[in-house]
Amino acid sequence: NFGIKYSWEENKIKILPQTYKETSFKVESDWSGASYWFSLLACADSGTFFLEGLKENSLQGDSKIVEIMSHLGIKSTFKNGGVLLQKQQVSGLESWDFTHCPDLAQTLAVTCAILGQNSIFTGLESLRIKETDRIHALQQELAKFNAELKEIKPDVFQVIPSVTMPKQVQIHTYEDHRMAMAFMPLATKTEVFFEDPAVVNKSYPSFWKHCNLAGISTEKIA
């Protein structure tokens, strides 16, 4: 509370000139960034993660990752100021509407493709006007490990999972930080080369360092 008074009527917020009051507050951790660790654990054979600074009743739309991943083998327990992730049986993700959490779509497309889930995705309209056309980018890169994101009717997409995994995959990141991070869990199944890995610096500069801490070996190639 910074001491600012306002009025809110229908879709209008009125704030008169005022002086802010200094206060201290704690910023919640980023659920978008957390989603990649949900995905990594879902694709891994074993393990647990504890993610600090995440709240159970978050206002962030991407906190929906908890519910989504409960269908893909991740049990979430909120405790000690964060969330403990543990593996559980995959029940299956039949469909999901990403209208209110579009930044999760790339992560879930890759996860479903790796886990053998034929899932239906809707609410992806905004993905075409993000850092890149993320629909096109996903289709191009999923194909590299024999998976698909197929538009079965206007704005309705089906993830068709990979049946065979190549020994190596080279991922083009399209100057899009989320393309690099979303495809990182593929490293649990095969060797992955990322073009322009520094693209993650836009939102998560320590991403590759945290991958190392999570057991993913990385090497810079000239």
Language model feature labels by segment:
Residues 1-222:
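Short, structured segments at the rim of ligand-binding sites
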